[in-house]
Each structure stands twice: as C-alpha cells, then as structure tokens.
Amino acid sequence: MKIVNHKMIKNLPVNKIRTNIFLSIITFFLLSCQTIDQKNSGSVINRDAELVLQNLFEIDPDTISIYKNAPATLIIPKITKAGLVLGGAYGEGVLRINEAPVDYYSLASASYGPQIGAQQYSNIIFFMTEEALQKFRVKDGWELGADAEVVFRDKGYSIGVSSKTISKPVYAVVFDQKGLLAGTSLVGAKFSRLIR
C-alpha cells in the first residue's frame, strides 16, 4: 500500500510558483546583467552615449538647446528591462559635465507585479541646475524625485519642451523603446557610480 503525504501534495503548487520565480530571477540576471569587461569599458559607453545623444537630437531638435543649457547630462544608451511577475532593469551610462565625460553610472531597479516580457530603451537625464547635479553626485543610490520631470517620447512625437519651458531642475527623457513590456518607468530606479 502506497502512503501519500498530503502536506507534499498541498504544497506542490506553492513550490512550483517559488521555483518559477527563482528561475525567472536567475534567467533575468544571466541575460541582462552586464559583466565588467571590454564591451562595457568607458570608451564603449562613451561611443554608445554619443550615438544615442545624436539620435535624440535628430528625432527631436528641441533637445539640443536643453543639452547646451544643462550643466550636466547623464546618458544611458541602453537599459534592458525584463519581467515575469518579478522584474528588473539595468543599464550603464556616462555623466557629462560641459560635454566632457567625468563619471560612469549604473541604473538598476526591481519590480513586482503583473508583468511579462522584455524591453530595451534609452534614457538621458539633463541636470538643469548645479544644485541638482551636486545632489546627484553626492548620493550613491540616487533616485528621481519630485524635483524631476520625466517624459516618455513616443515615435513620431516631439517631447514638447525646450530649455525655456522646463520648470524642474532635473529633466529625464526615455525614448527609443524596443520590445514588449507594459509600464516602462524610472520610478524606484537607483543610480550608482561605477569605476571604469
């Protein structure tokens, strides 16, 4: 006669869910986390940042005046976001002051909730005041706050602002979205300094 452990049967769906979540997390980090090697060297980040910046200027010429009037700009050429219930995003970029590269930063975020899929996008953050720039540089794990305006640029549409109409000290543009994942957001994203 076969003895059946009812506790094991009862916990089977929970264990299956935990296993799927665990595998999703591991898969996400294996696919999206970038290792510190030649492909992520400072020179490669700088090159990619310049290409992304020129792309933004082409699709929205109003951003040229914003760039020229900003004391500093953080350019993250590619952010990869993926999720299956648990999700996360990661990207690396360069901080430019007076158009010269001075530091490298990562963006990382985690999320939980209904989500499935993957997406890549670019992000440029314009620091419009010296005070906003200093707050960013002194805090490791900096997050966008109430002093920031975030614009998600859809294909074919201008972001609708110029350096004369910006009212916040931090201005972020998310653009060039590729892939399918609802809810692209910078909420909860942490920016940390990298050594490159």
Predicted regions and their residues:
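Bacterial N-terminal signal peptides that target proteins for export
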Residues: 3-22
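C-terminal motif of bacterial Sec signal peptides marking the signal peptidase cleavage site
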Residues: 29-32
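Small-residue-enriched, tightly packed secondary-structure blocks
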Residues: 34-196
